[in-house]
């Protein structure tokens, strides 16, 4: 299937309905089907309407009826806009996930989460934000003519995505009772944060702790990161939005915890 690079912007979109499709840009995935990089409305951790980006892929041709949907919650890539997985789609790893489902007639959607490819800081491992992104891109896919994303929904995620998937299961009835969620698979979800913190301190992956701490401090007003961080290192927090996980590890792994 050949696609063009034209970006389609919807006319007069609602400014407060989660899942409203704001724009779509075709992405070429060859004979697997059709795909788009999309921008859609979700809700921020502050409860405000926010733009979020992601990917929607479907088998070629108009759906003969409702198709089952897989909503993928991605693992940790970083906190900067440049780390949004949709910017690298299609890649070898993403196609490996998408292809088997497209071949079986599924629609596959994948959010970039709040703050990655959209305004604001990425609320890393903030479950409600992750779950909203996962749900709302399904609603966006449902509004696309011919895609047929109205069938049963399964959510899968690994690592950070596993954390998102757990919150999808926990918050489904509150956030998306309109969606027919029939299954959730949470792979390697970070859950016991006290144990994880002790394990990660001084390791090659200490940067994860800084990402989580900065995210929580930006999300919850009662948390003051400056009160627990060495003043000599505060300026390094700006580096969180200057690169992806490799850059973050390089900057923060050598800092005494």
Each PLM stretch: what is its role?
Residues 44-103:
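Short, surface-exposed "cap/lid" segments of acyl-processing enzymes
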Residues 76, 107, 112-116:
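Short beta-to-alpha linker loops that shape the active-site pocket of alpha/beta-hydrolase fold enzymes
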Residues 66-69, 103-109, 149-152, 179-183:
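Loop/turn elements at helix/coil->beta-strand transitions in domains of secreted/extracellular proteins
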Residues 96, 124-145:
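Alpha/beta-hydrolase active-site loop
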Residues 1-2, 7-64:
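Catalytic-loop region of hydrolases
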Residues 139-208:
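Primarily recognizes the serine-hydrolase "nucleophile elbow" in alpha/beta-hydrolase
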Residues 187-257:
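Accessory cap/linker subdomain of secreted extracellular hydrolases
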């Amino acid at each position: 299937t050949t696609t063009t690079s034209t970006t389609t912007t919807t006319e007069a979109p609602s400014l407060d309905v989660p899942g409203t499709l704001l724009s779509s840009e075709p992405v070429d995935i060859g004979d697997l089907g059709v795909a788009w990089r999309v921008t859609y409305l979700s809700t921020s951790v502050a409860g405000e309407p926010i733009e979020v980006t992601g990917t929607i892929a479907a088998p070629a041709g108009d759906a003969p009826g409702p198709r089952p949907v897989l909503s993928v919650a991605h693992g940790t890539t970083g906190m900067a806009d440049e780390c949004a997985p949709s910017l690298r789609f299609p890649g070898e790893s993403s196609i490996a996930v998408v292809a088997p489902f497209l071949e079986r007639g599924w629609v596959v959607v994948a959010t970039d989460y709040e703050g990655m490819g959209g305004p604001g800081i990425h609320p890393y491992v903030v479950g409600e934000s992750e779950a909203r992104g996962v749900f709302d891109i399904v609603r966006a896919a449902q509004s696309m003519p011919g895609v047929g994303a109205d069938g049963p929904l399964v959510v899968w995620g690994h690592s950070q995505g596993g954390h998102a998937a757990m919150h999808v299961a926990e918050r489904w009835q509150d956030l998306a009772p309109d969606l027919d969620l029939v299954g959730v698979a949470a792979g390697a979800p970070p859950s016991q944060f006290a144990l994880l913190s002790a394990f990660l301190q001084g390791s090659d992956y200490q940067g994860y702790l800084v990402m989580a701490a900065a995210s929580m401090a930006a999300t919850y007003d009662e948390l003051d990161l400056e009160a627990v961080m060495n003043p000599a290192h505060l300026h390094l927090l700006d580096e969180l939005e200057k690169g992806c996980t490799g850059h973050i590890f390089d900057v923060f792994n050598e800092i005494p915890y």
